[in-house]
Amino acid sequence: MKYAVRLEQCKRSNYAYQEIRSRHYIPNHGAIGQQLHYLIYLDKEIVGIISGGSAAYAVACRDSFFHINKDNRQIALNGIVDNTVFRLEKNLPNLGTQILAMWRRRVADDWFLKYGVQVAGFETFIIENEHRKGAMYKADNWTFCGETSGSTKLHEHGVIKSSVRLRTEKKLVFCKWIKGRKLPEDYVSSWNLPRGVIKGQLSFL
């Protein structure tokens, strides 16, 4: 069944967005880097939010999936969008999968318009419990790549701050290519921080 859903781009400061974001299982500590946010409408009702942001700097299983290495990392990561937030407050069969597929197509177009880079793929990180196992991503044909280790190092402008190590919960990692797309090889960011690396980016080692 197809539902009458649509996505409306909004600012992160949007009241409705923030209201729903406050109920997401991951605490709202703000967002860094490139990002796009959307309200999810079912008919005329706002039923959720979904967001995309800059890719995490270093994730072993993700890097293997997208063939990312230390030589191409800074440029290649610009072609990956992280599905940072997805909260749906309407429980209908297959609704989440329909929205996820719609978001992939929409954010790829909007990302190019805003940042000037063609999106080649997506990543997401899920803190698993008895209810969260990535079912919507599996239904949308994302690939389960592995788990993070539960340990991160803080990066600033691509340099690991070895004195700073943060403990985090382990996360399931799902990724998806856009068919026929390749990661950028010569992208120069139009954003206002150094190319490809966002201050404060985390790596999941």
Language-model regions, residue ranges each:
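Double-stranded DNA-binding cores of transcription factors and transposases
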Residues: 3, 21-25, 34
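Ser/Thr- (and often Asn-) enriched beta-sheet segments in non-cytosolic proteins
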Residues: 4-6, 203
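Acyl-donor binding region in acyl/amide transferases
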Residues: 6-15, 31-36, 42-43, 49-180
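Hotspots on structured nucleic-acid-binding interfaces, especially in canonical RNA/DNA-binding domains
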Residues: 13-23, 28
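Short, charged low-complexity linker/loop segments at the C-terminal edge of domains
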Residues: 179-192
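Short, cationic low-complexity segments
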Residues: 190-205
